[in-house]
């Protein structure tokens, strides 16, 4: 039996390729998550923000840290002890610089680790990430509700389902139309909703005032880029030109290998004409059939999440 427990706060930072940021401390051989021991009376959240800033020069945004729970494993460097870690999930673009106790940083694919891992990572957390890699999704949809009432039902079902499964929702930040319907349903069921909206659309789309967090950016391009930085997957609800723009932007980037994140079309009847057009383009030789086949089409949240979590990235077009 371990003689003592070592309590730490740590963070799982994930990049657009699905890799996880790991660090090796000076004088040790195994890689672990960034973080460390809380100081007296310091919360787990404050501790991980402080430690990551001191050791890697990264300023974590507290609003974007998602609690994962508490994990226990054999300590990597202290014989006869267990490490008890309060973990947070952070999906964002970061540039770590090793400092203080850190000797080395590495971005690690949980499925094919290229470094030696501490037991907490190898035995507990990475298997969970492999089984359920999707923790945050971008929801693309319209700022209007459309003419078909089933659109709102789809949006509400998606928002509620994401909340019930503990999946964070990132969307365009509006409170009207299907955007608002999905966000309200997620919030009403205890979910975390982050909005990203350009300044010039704050008044036009009426920014949602009740979100978990709202970011205001300068341009539509920055909105798409920011949403992409924060998520593990993309889900498209019914929408118009803006929704199509967001979908094709994410899909093109996927084809080029700029990210390895699944894309889903939620509501098969609405998206049937789009899928038909894409198949026609594939038949004409303008799109690879493999890229069309990797798109997920779903009608229920359970079906959607199973498909997102079991998805395999296609080979990049120009690889």
Model regions and ranges:
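Short, acidic/small-residue loops that bind anionic groups at enzyme active sites
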Residues: 197, 237, 251-276, 287-292
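NUDIX/MutT-family hydrolases
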Residues: 86-91, 97-131, 300
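Active-site-adjacent beta-strand/loop module that shapes the phosphate/pyrophosphate-binding cleft
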Residues: 6, 66, 71-97, 110
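Glycine-rich beta-alpha loop segments
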Residues: 133-192
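Glycine-rich, small/polar surface segments that engage phosphate groups of diverse ligands
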Residues: 171-220
